[in-house]
């Protein structure tokens, strides 16, 4: 339980350290599935209209849910909470996930009320996500936010970085109102968690200038100065 150690932070040394206990943190956890949040138990979560990839039920981990663990709406969430318990029980201390992947491999996760509505956020879904994130920190799992993925982080595709219109890309990769709102919502709702990393994106292809602007904007918002990283 990270509440016994305090906030995890970068303090200029090789490893992240907890502000309270001073202990070093060596990240050991699952980096897949990136579609961890593509779960049938979350409100407003549906399978991709084009990818035809089924949503996760996390049913095999129902047996790992314990009395007193969170759930919602008459027992929803027990499978995904059980999956976190399992990861913690086998010695993991972190897990990663995409909060947004419209146009990406899974095309089945978004924080909005609708897949194509980047202006309005789904409050009930975000509340349910927060219950999962809270439990994760309580069982000793760091939250690794992969904020976007390779296929939809900008209007450039492939290794050749060909110009293309990517509908899911927030402001086409630039720091416009869509990207600012997205960052503000995630920071406002989730930055209070003690162990958290902001990853600008999985296999990120934004330009260096766009990466710097996005990282700088997140830094200006996050009052807890959580680490900001980049997956190249």
Regions found by a protein language model. Name each.
Residues 11-232:
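Active-site mouth of glycoside hydrolases
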């Amino acid at each position: 339980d990270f509440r016994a150690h305090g906030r995890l932070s970068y303090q200029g040394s090789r490893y992240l350290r907890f502000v309270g206990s001073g202990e070093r943190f060596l990240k050991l956890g699952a980096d897949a599935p990136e579609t961890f949040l593509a779960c049938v138990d979350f409100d407003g979560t549906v399978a991709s209209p084009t990818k035809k990839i089924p949503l996760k039920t996390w049913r095999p981990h129902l047996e790992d849910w314990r009395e007193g663990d969170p759930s919602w709406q008459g027992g929803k969430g027990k499978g995904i909470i059980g999956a976190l318990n399992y990861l913690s029980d086998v010695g993991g201390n972190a897990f990663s996930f995409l909060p947004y992947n419209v146009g990406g491999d899974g095309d089945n996760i978004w924080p909005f009320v609708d897949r194509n509505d980047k202006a309005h956020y789904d409050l009930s879904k975000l509340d349910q996500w927060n219950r999962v994130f809270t439990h994760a920190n309580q069982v000793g799992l760091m939250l690794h936010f992969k904020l976007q993925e390779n296929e939809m982080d900008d209007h450039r595709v492939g290794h050749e970085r060909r110009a293309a219109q990517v509908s899911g890309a927030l402001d086409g990769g630039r720091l416009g109102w869509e990207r600012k709102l997205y960052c503000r919502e995630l920071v406002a709702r989730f930055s209070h968690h003690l162990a958290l990393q902001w990853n600008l994106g999985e296999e990120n292809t934004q330009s260096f200038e766009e990466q710097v602007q996005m990282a700088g904007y997140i830094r200006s918002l996050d009052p807890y100065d959580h680490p900001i990283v980049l997956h190249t």
